[in-house]
Amino acid sequence: MEHLTRNSQSPLLFGPETTFAAYVAQFSGHNARLETLGIFLSAVVRATNDVPFFPTLYKTDEDKFRLRKLATRLSDHALEVCLSLDCLNDLQLAFQYENFIVHTFVDGDQSYSSWRRLGDVIASMLALGYHERVETRSRIPDFLVELRQSAFARIYTDDKEVSIFLGRPPRLSRRFCHFRIPIALDSFEANESASGTEVVGPANEIKIDYRAGCSWAALCALLKEEILELFIEKNREHCVQRASVIWAKAEAQWKQLPTHMRYDVSCLNDYRRSPFERDFLISARLDHIHIRFLLRFILINSLAQPDDEMIQIAHEMLTLVVQAVLARDRLANSGSGLVWKVILYGLPASGIILLAILEQRNPYHFGGLSRAKVLQNLRILVAEIQIGALSHPREPNFALLTRAAQTIENFLDSEERHDHHPNGQINTHHDAAPGQMGPWASNLNLEAWDFDLGFWENLAEHPFLSNLEFPT
């Protein structure tokens, strides 16, 4: 420990000619530091999340969770010592970020510990100057410029996604950042020949890898920050105009994304694509649709009564999430895990769909969609949660997923038990007409991001569901 601490007090040296191997040699082997140990321990925790059975370390869930807790505790101790040394560098920032991710696994995405650690990561990144023009610093080798741009893009994205999920203001504003990403994905426009055939250009040479995933997520996060600002815009007309501009940017951004990076329905069955590439394609499309989903929140009059466009957006988002859940054995994490996709995209989409069905006058067809297809997606999501495919009882997101599944299942059961009015209206309230839910709707207090545990508990109080008991 003393040797590691002493090494951590030494600066990481580099110049314009420094190679990646020479840089890594400063914190590996005999030069290993506390940051090195911490990143290794973080990798152990991540592995316990992806590898259910590893006989030399754990054979049961109890062993696995014990190892996860131990590795997290040791990682925390190593980080505390690193911070006390006051020797901030690139490696420590990477360690801090990995420690934040570890706590989302151990404490949950809603925990204060995870929220605080993300704030610490942002503070360290700003102290290092990653938000400035790192590429103009002449002494920095190219690989380190790319590393710092990737770190900025990843941290900037996480700040926006966590803010949306928790309903809190973002802490890293684009207004004070020189926004650069590792790969300029949106700079390649598709050109067409005289015959109308798309010309294959440099865009097709861009590899689908972590850099590409990080870059696309950051581009989407940039637009999501603009959307977050609209939620405090008091001028309705100005808000609508800005929302239109943001969506035009999002559409142009999607069209400029290289063709081989765009999702299509056949990609999950394309044997030529790797599990990583399949996950990237779904993630990229989800990020794009999420922008439209958030924008629609700005424009509808009541979240308790979603319009047809909101329903269609939610349906596409839920369909993508369900496809990812069903194809999980053919996917590899390209930047965001499956559970995070379900929580950030799947649950909000499900919540909107439930609200829409409860408020619709026509019980068999709504929003231009097949009711049977919509209900099928909900049933699949509930089934996958209930069989434990997404979360274990000892994992922190289990309560949120389970409560959401219980509410959705209760709704699906109610669909079969309740009588319908002769004109096709669902009997959503004994005394109120469809779309007028009285006290329940006024107490819902939906915000664009309020699809956490409280939302599902409130939804359970809907008059259509409240007379049925939840399973325990």
Residue ranges and their predicted role:
Residues 1-78, 209-266, 472:
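Transcriptional activation interfaces
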Residues 9-19, 65-94, 117-135, 154, ...:
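Long, amphipathic alpha-helical regulatory blocks in the mid-to-C-terminal portion
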Residues 48-52, 100-107, 298-301, 357-358:
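Short coil/turn linking the two alpha-helices of tandem helical-hairpin repeats
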Residues 51-67, 103-118, 237-238, 304-309:
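Short coil/turn connectors between adjacent alpha-helices in alpha-solenoid helical repeat scaffolds
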Residues 100-191, 212-215, 221-222, 359, ...:
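Acidic/serine-rich, low-complexity amphipathic helices located in mid- to C-terminal regulatory regions
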Residues 197-199, 206, 218:
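Polar, glycine-rich mid-to-C-terminal structural blocks
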Residues 334-338, 388-391, 411-472:
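Intrinsically disordered, low-complexity transcriptional activation domains
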